[in-house]
Curated annotation (Swiss-Prot):
GO term, biological process aspect, one: nucleosome assembly
Family: Belongs to the nucleosome assembly protein (NAP) family.
This protein's name: Putative nucleosome assembly protein C2D10.11C
Species in which this protein is naturally found: Schizosaccharomyces pombe (strain 972 / ATCC 24843) (Fission yeast)
Region (Disordered): 1-30, 345-379
Primary location class: nucleus
Amino acid sequence: MSKGPGDFKKSWNGFAAQTPQNTPSSDVHLSKAALEKARQTLQSQLEDKSAHDEVSGLLRNNPAMLSMIEGRLSSLVGKSSGYIESLAPAVQNRITALKGLQKDCDAIQYEFRQKMLDLETKYEKKYQPIFSRRAEIIKGVSEPVDDELDHEEEIFQNNLPDPKGIPEFWLTCLHNVFLVGEMITPEDENVLRSLSDIRFTNLSGDVHGYKLEFEFDSNDYFTNKILTKTYYYKDDLSPSGEFLYDHAEGDKINWIKPEKNLTVRVETKKQRNRKTNQTRLVRTTVPNDSFFNFFSPPQLDDDESDDGLDDKTELLELDYQLGEVFKDQIIPLAIDCFLEEGDLSDFNQMDEEDSEDAYTDEEDLSSDDEEILSSEISD
């Protein structure tokens, strides 16, 4: 799976979910500036990790020092700094009252977020007839009626045969969205050509979250007609009053044959018996990069090591961001993605040679070089 931007809101309890209150309405696609900022953030994190590893190495080589530090830290857990206890009783009572008032604020904030989700669900139902009509045209179930056409739009004439619907509509959409397009392999394209619709619905009742549905025509790879991916929010809000992601679940893909499974590949190795000198071929299955890994989201284990936890956290951040991209960008703005309109068009048209990364710093200009440069500028 391709790595993506890691610039996400975090808390100890999860990742902040985008809602109608914090989702940028004009951010159709990930901009180059955002990606560069994420790259710089990742570089900073790598530098911090390097320093952390160095300190960890020193502590591992000095068990006495490590034991002393752990003892000091364990004695501080849950221990007050003593400041509150030093205040006058009347002041402590006022602080207690403020804590109670804050609980009232939290309850109102939770009610507000719930109402926002209810409002989003209400308007989601208004979108559904439009999205259903869009799907009919894309699939070729029916043709546009006169009222749906803009007769001022230029129609280019040619002698090409008239296909059914809009071929490879969703594959083109996904390719044109940077974060998702990076996940698609040439082998994935063979399946994604049969992708006929993508939908989302908010979860109902006491369960908070949303579900993505990917509808496929018959293909030579799996038997599923619909693949779903469901994102769940936590019941509690973040300190800033936002819903937090809890976990995601994806459908099991029913591959027609093991060799059709795009998420794994078979590696063959030759082994030689030391005693008999005979050789044999050993086949092992290893993970493979594929868009369809999206339906097998990473899961955090309680006994995960620190390094493993960091890697899983990055994958979780990317997975949640992908869900938001589908829900807030690809599905509601599918035609913009297909036509490469909006921010994405500007991003894709930038030549690599124009980017900052394409240039390297050279030595300071000599006086002769400066004269030549000044001459070229003046000309």
